[in-house]
């Protein structure tokens, strides 16, 4: 079942939720201090401008519950509001907080099977708005959605943005989408993340992406890109690329192991070498023991680390999570 099928199946429940959000009595609003309370929604406020006015007033509330309600309000109301009014309000808004609200509403329309150009407008502003805080806000609005399926090479462009804030938000989107939308099991999402990481000239962004995504579904081209990053001038990038290689699909494991074994002897950073040992162990399980034994003399300071891996791998545990747990237990016992 596709994401679009699920979206259409959920339309009825979305409408019910929207109506409940628009109900006159809002319990969250009651939690606000009297000075911060906004009036209950009235029929006249159930318009784009009415909702925006309510949100502007309410965002100063001391009640976090009320602000959470406001964050959901416009997004969940999006399918009932005129698309042209919503888009026009988005285009003329320059307060980053309100931009994020409006962008999330437009994204929601596309996610729920309505006009695709709604999300396209958000993506275009993320790429082209002159204000980096606005660009960052629109990127956050696309987080944990299917945006990467509809926006082409947007993320490869965003990770090269002049603003560090924008680059960081783009990297966060890629990681959170990979883990929380696709569960690390979507090849397109994984390959998009790797392509963006390789395209970035910001070592922190590249490391953030490669060090956190799941790479079990990446294609051969993505594996080659990760292998090339093992030669990066940044130790942080080399360590993250090493971690990413440890999780590649079975068809790419031999190539990944060969790359890591070939780079280990020339690597000078102990943290990167330690990451390489872990990925070699992960790629080979018990079959990695002879390789680890041959590496033992390269760096005497890491001999205890290698010995710990060898001891755990010789237990023939069949789950990586169990291997990690036992390795941690051995380290704590030392």
Residue spans for each PLM region:
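Terminal, low-structured helical/coil segments at or just beyond the last alpha-helical repeat
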Residues: 297-334
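Amphipathic alpha-helical scaffolding segments comprising HEAT/armadillo-like alpha-solenoid repeats
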Residues: 41-57, 79-91, 112-126, 147-160, ...
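Alpha-solenoid HEAT/ARM repeat scaffold
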Residues: 64-68, 96, 100-104, 136-137, ...
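Alpha-helix N-cap/helix-start positions at coil->helix boundaries
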Residues: 60-64, 95-97, 132-133, 164-165, ...
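Alpha-solenoid repeat junctions
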Residues: 74-78, 106, 110-114, 142, ...
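Alpha-helical adaptor scaffolds
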Residues: 211-214, 235, 239-265
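Bacterial N-terminal signal peptides
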Residues: 12-24
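N-terminal leader/linker segments that initiate helical-solenoid repeat arrays
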Residues: 27-86, 94-97, 103
């Amino acid at each position: 079942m596709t994401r679009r099928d699920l979206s259409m199946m959920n339309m009825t429940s979305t409408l019910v939720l929207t109506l409940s959000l628009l109900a006159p009595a809002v319990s969250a609003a009651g939690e606000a201090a009297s000075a911060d309370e906004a009036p209950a929604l009235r029929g006249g406020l159930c318009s784009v401008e009415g909702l925006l006015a309510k949100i502007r007033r309410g965002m100063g509330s001391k009640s976090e519950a009320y602000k959470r309600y406001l964050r959901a309000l416009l997004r969940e109301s999006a399918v009932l509001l005129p698309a042209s009014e919503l888009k026009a309000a988005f285009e003329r808004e320059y307060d980053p907080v309100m931009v994020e609200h409006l962008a999330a509403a437009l994204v929601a329309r596309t996610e729920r099977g309505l006009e695709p150009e709604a999300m396209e407008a958000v993506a275009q502003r993320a790429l082209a708005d002159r204000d980096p805080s606005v660009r960052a806000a629109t990127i956050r609005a696309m987080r944990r959605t299917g945006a990467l399926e509809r926006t082409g090479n947007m993320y490869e462009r965003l990770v090269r943005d002049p603003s560090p804030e924008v680059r960081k938000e783009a990297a966060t989107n890629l990681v959170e989408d990979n883990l929380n939308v696709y569960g690390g099991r979507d090849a397109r999402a994984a390959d998009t993340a790797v392509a963006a990481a390789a395209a970035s000239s910001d070592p922190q962004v590249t490391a953030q992406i490669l060090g956190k995504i799941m790479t079990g579904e990446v294609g051969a081209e993505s594996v080659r890109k990760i292998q090339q990053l093992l030669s990066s001038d940044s130790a942080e990038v080399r360590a993250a690329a090493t971690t990413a290689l440890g999780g590649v699909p079975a068809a790419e494991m031999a190539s990944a192991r060969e790359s890591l074994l070939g780079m280990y002897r020339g690597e000078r950073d102990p943290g990167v070498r330690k990451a390489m040992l872990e990925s070699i162990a992960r790629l080979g399980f018990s079959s990695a023991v002879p390789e680890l034994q041959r590496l033992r003399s390269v760096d005497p300071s890491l001999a205890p680390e290698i010995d710990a891996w060898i001891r755990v791998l010789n237990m023939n545990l069949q789950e990586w999570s169990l291997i990690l747990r036992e390795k941690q237990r051995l380290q704590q016992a030392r």
